Amino acid sequence: MSHRPKRGRERATLIGVIISVVGAGIIGLTTALTLADRGHSVTVHDPAPASGASHHAGGMLAPTAEVVYKQDPLFPLMRTSAEWYPELITLTAKYTDLPTGYRTDGTLVVARDIADKTHLSELGEYQSRHGMAVDKLTVRQARKLEPALSPAINGAVAIDGDHQVQPRLFTRALLDACRSAGVTFTGNHVNSLDALEADQVVVANGLGASALVPGLDLRPVYGDVLRVRVPQHQYPLLTRVVRGFVEDRPVYLIPREDGTLTIGATTREDGRDQPQVQGVHQLLRDAIELVPAVEECDFVEATAGARPGTPDDLPYLGRIDERTVVSTGYFRHGILLAALGARVGAELVDRQEPAIDLSACDPRRHS
């Protein structure tokens, strides 16, 4: 029995360029879907789709809360990608009914002690100077929004523009959407770009890109992430993302629709790819300091993933030759920057002028 080809594949067959995308994490999948929607014939090569950094990520779309001092070139990328995210969610929904976990509830950032309050205040001033919307709250106001917060916190701010997706749901939806759009998947591990039969190639396989493209200075930055389940009688424990500082250590708690909380994340460069006891202990301790009822939750899992970092923490995003576009090195911001990576990656493949200045992201800047 023959089946009528899906609309996406019909368009690709008629007008598309043949494109290979190396890597099926969040960047590779969103780029592949965007290219397929533009009418191209797309093949994705990855022996284990959505099993790398995307599998372990928290999924915060937080261009304001994720601000780090002295990383000014990163801010416009983060803000722009956050603005483009609704379009990416809409594109995904065009090809699949599977959920993405996209939520626009906003974020609270809280301070545990007086020193943390000072840090939060100084960070808020820095964010405001860069045009970011941050609303200062009293402890009473913060606890009215999230009653599970500890009465011992010392300060809080609300960031309504910081949202979230659930990465495991999102990548599952993207895989389904890509297939519906006509994308082909192989389980191949790519050892050489020359072996790919394609007009254009997008290298989006995270840390593995350095084996395919000389001159990329990528390093693995590991992070421990926890998941706990909220008891039914306490659900929902939180209604929005809660980030905080505990003795100057950052921690976040992300509520999910399935009744779990994601708690993260440590940052280490020790080469150890399993969750570390010290990191698990630190995250639980700090989460309980901010939300005491976490102590009553069921422990679900601890995972550790390697994020692809660069020397300046900016991604490698750009064309390196007539056939090859590089899109990797997104470090801690891969989920957030996926909307930008997908759209700009597709623009580069189509030889269009990118919608944002990419000069700081030149893949050759460290070679």
Regions found by a protein language model. Give the residues of each.
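Active-site substrate-recognition segment that forms the wall
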Residues: 33-38, 47, 60, 98-102, ...
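Short hydrophobic core segments
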Residues: 22, 197-208, 342
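Dinucleotide-binding Rossmann-like beta1-alpha1 core, especially the glycine-rich loop
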Residues: 60-141
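N-terminal Rossmann-like FAD-binding beta1-loop-alpha1 element of flavoenzymes
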Residues: 18-43
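C-terminal catalytic lobe of FAD-dependent flavoproteins
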Residues: 297-367
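Conserved Rossmann-like nucleotide-cofactor binding loop
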Residues: 27, 50, 208
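Short loop/edge segments at beta-strand edges and connector loops
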Residues: 46, 138-139, 186-189, 301-303
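Helical element adjacent to the flavin cofactor pocket in flavoenzyme catalytic cores
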Residues: 157-193
